[in-house]
Each structure stands twice: as structure tokens, then as C-alpha cells.
């Protein structure tokens, strides 16, 4: 019985420690290393069978704040994001444009911009978020269709 308890405790502790390795950012931070953040996101995505969304923008960007609020406050969107995606904020600002990191992806025309990656970090899609806008917010149906199109297949 003690061996079973010890095994379960170690298994739980290992899962807890691994889960602590990836912590989503709440803000765009010019001091963060996007390569390190992506590496942690890939590890987490592989263990949870999720895709990754690189959310490129900055604290200066009003639409970046609008999309954050929309994703957080729209129940159906938040549910899809929580179940199928790992979000990584990539800063683009005058303090740090992360040009070297972003040079490995297609050119961006505006912010915020999403890159959808599979759990191994392979680019699946480049999304101009302007296509998801509606008036001064985002279109729930378009956003849900986008998330459903690029979510991973669960095995």
C-alpha cells in the first residue's frame, strides 16, 4: 500500500512540477526571450496535445488589449482556447521588436497578429486578426470558426 501511495505521489508531483514550467504571460514584455517562451510552450503543448498561438503585439496596441479582453470575456472563445491552445505573447515594441525571432515567420502587416503552430512548433497558419474584427471589437462567429479550423485533432 505504501508503494502505491509513493508511486501516486511521485506521479502527481511530477505532473505538478511539469505543469509549472509553462506560465502564460498576461502582458507583452520586451524583456522576455521569445525562444525560451516558445520552447516552454512546445513542451507543454506536446504533453497536452494542444496547438500554439503566437500572439504578436505590444502594450502600446489598443487592438491587442481589445483582443485579450475578447478572448478572456467571450465564454465560447475562452473555452476553445483553454481546451485546444497554448498562448504565447510575443512582444513587438520600440523597446524590443524581436526581429530575429519574428524573421522566421511570414511578414506581419498589423497588430495583433497570430501565428498558429502545431504542438511541435511547426507553422500551420498566419492570421491577420483584422479579418476577425467587427466594428470596434471582434466577431464571435469568425473567431470560433478560426479556432475550430486550427485546433488539433484529439487522439
Language-model segments: which ranges?
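Bacterial Sec-dependent N-terminal signal peptides
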Residues: 1-22
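N-proximal helix/coil linker or "cap" segments that precede and/or mark the start of modular domains
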Residues: 18-32
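A short beta-strand-turn-helix
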Residues: 32-52
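Loop/turn elements at helix/coil->beta-strand transitions in domains of secreted/extracellular proteins
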Residues: 48-52, 83-88, 110-112, 119
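Conserved redox-active cysteine motifs that mediate thiol-disulfide chemistry
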Residues: 56-72
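Non-catalytic, surface beta->alpha helical segment in thiol-disulfide oxidoreductase systems
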Residues: 109-154
